[in-house]
Amino acid sequence: MSPLAHRRFLKMNGLGNEIVVLDLRGTPHIVQPQEARAIAADPRSRFDQLMVLHDPVTAGTDAALRIYNTDGSESGACGNGTRCVAWAMLEDPVMGRPAERLTLQSRAGLLAVTRVSATDFTVDMGPPRLRWDEIPLAEPFPDTRRIELQIGPIDDPILHSPGVVSMGNPHAVFFVDRDPASYDLARIGPLLEAHPIFPERANISVAQVRGPEHIVLRVWERGAGLTRACGSAACAALVAAARLRLTGRRAVVTLPGGDLVIDWGEDDHVRMTGPTELEWEGTLAPSLFAGAA
């Protein structure tokens, strides 16, 4: 029987971004890609990101965190999911303990989370990575504020010249004049995600700047597809816009699921503030893993 059978999980969302939180502290088991896909295939535990808690391995941290996409691949960052993990660790009667701050160790580095209210949290996502080899890109670009990349006819591209940023995972942000909802991101997104310029694939965003403190965003999420919200993409969009002087260093980013406040501080850290919501709790059925061995 899978070590995940009968494990309790929390189904949550951050602005409609579907999150499952699974606590594996106290057990050595590492979720395998086929197990993540099996959990995602069940309507009760369907997720955009699976957030798995492990015992801390770094002094001064509260937990280690592994993040899975629906296709079983791992991600270095998920801002909306990190807020949900913070709620689980601070508010859930089974997992939780009273505190105002948490520090989590993810594949991308340390994530510091601060409580704003019972449901809202601020996540310090750390500094953005802006060099071409940090994002990473497949070839050198000395200026990543805009790179040579387009989709559509060469003389009339649908999207072109994105800014590229890593927030622990690679992002390409295309700035447009029209409402981002008018672009067929379900068709364009997977083509750009897998473009050879992105050796680790990329999250693809279409962004419209509506003022110096307001960005409207739609996101095709690497390994997950269209999503109602993506916290790391919102952070990347603010950084990309500020580098082009389209906005200041603080803005409200409006996604289909709602608003996030993104602040790129003078200390170079990007902080994201937004809500969480618990939808239900459940246990993983053993039958989910019958074909996942």
Curated annotation (Swiss-Prot):
Record's catalysed reaction(s): (2S,6S)-2,6-diaminopimelate = meso-2,6-diaminopimelate
Keyword Aminoacyl-tRNA synthetase: no
InterPro entries, A to Z: DAP_epimerase_AS, DAP_epimerase_DapF
Active site: 78 (proton donor), 230 (proton acceptor)
E.C. number(s) listed in UniProt: 5.1.1.7
Residues involved in substrate binding: 17, 49, 69, 79-80, 169, 203, 221-222, 231-232
GO CC term (a single one): cytosol
Oxidoreductase keyword on record: no
Pathway: Amino-acid biosynthesis; L-lysine biosynthesis via DAP pathway; DL-2,6-diaminopimelate from LL-2,6-diaminopimelate: step 1/1
Cellular compartments annotated: Cytoplasm
Gene Ontology biological process terms from the UniProt entry: lysine biosynthetic process via diaminopimelate
Example of a GO MF term: diaminopimelate epimerase activity
Could be important to modulate the pK values of the two catalytic cysteine residues (site feature) positions: 171, 221
Keyword annotations: Amino-acid biosynthesis, Cytoplasm, Isomerase, Lysine biosynthesis
Subunit record text: Homodimer.
NCBIfam families: DapF (TIGR00652)
Function: Catalyzes the stereoinversion of LL-2,6-diaminopimelate (L,L-DAP) to meso-diaminopimelate (meso-DAP), a precursor of L-lysine and an essential component of the bacterial peptidoglycan.
Family: Belongs to the diaminopimelate epimerase family.
Protein name (record): Diaminopimelate epimerase
